[in-house]
Amino acid sequence: MSESWQPTLTEIALVFSRLADRVAEQEQIVLDPYVEQALRDALFHLELQIPGWEPAFDADAARAMRKASQESLDRGNEREAFGRALRGLSFAPHDPGLFYLLGSACFESGSVELALRVLCHTLWINPGHGGARADLEALSAFLDDSDDQQRAA
């Protein structure tokens, strides 16, 4: 149960739904700063909730959106994958698979910092998520390599 100042899981799901609408309306591949900040805020508030405490609002719809998001990523349409993952999160706000796809779409669209946050959130929900762990380790190794090369120059 959340404190009175904290949004409920239903309110967080509504945020994901509205963000999905906003992303669907835009033509640009680069994420809108408003969407990025709203997503950061939603992640913060979700981490104050207990994953699995409340059931998904519509697990079947979330599963369908997860599949649609993966197909969009496979086709190279990051914006569509991002929007579909957000729509899926409006049905299941603690779904690690949807967060993983959201993080992948963030990375593919150039929002590396947000991708790192979302992948970390995926691991917060499910520490055994293999894809998120592997991607996070690869990103960390790449970023560590970049820092070493910049220092050498």
Language-model segments: residues:
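Register position in tetratricopeptide repeats
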Residues: D74, E108, A141-D145
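TPR-adjacent "capping" and linker segments in tetratricopeptide-repeat scaffold/adaptor proteins
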Residues: E3, E47-A64, R87-S90
